[in-house]
Amino acid sequence: MSFDFETKISAKFMNEKAVVLNPKMQNILTERGFGELQNDALVLDSFETLYLLYNNKLELKKINKNIIFDELIQKYLQKDDDALTRFLLYRDLRTKGYVVKDGFGFGSDFRVYEKG
């Protein structure tokens, strides 16, 4: 999936998740199938966060310090040995134009939808 937005999204890293607080930036992402609205924030899954960082579309900060892709993937790998594999699968599906959401469990990592 190519990116049709020029704006770099700003997010805060809180509780191991990227959180987008700006409503305009939330709209940019939700229109493209990213994240889940929780109260007044858009929360991104780990694979969405990695994907946006990898494609240089996300500026992620924790206490005014930028977090880069390599740092974040290492953090996720400490808790989940399959984090890199999940990211690569997610990236492949998004690149092919699919909207990808977190799975429901029971051995399902993703839900995959055609865009539209």
Name each model feature, range by range.
Residues 1-116:
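Long Lys/Arg-rich low-complexity intrinsically disordered regions in nucleic-acid-associated proteins
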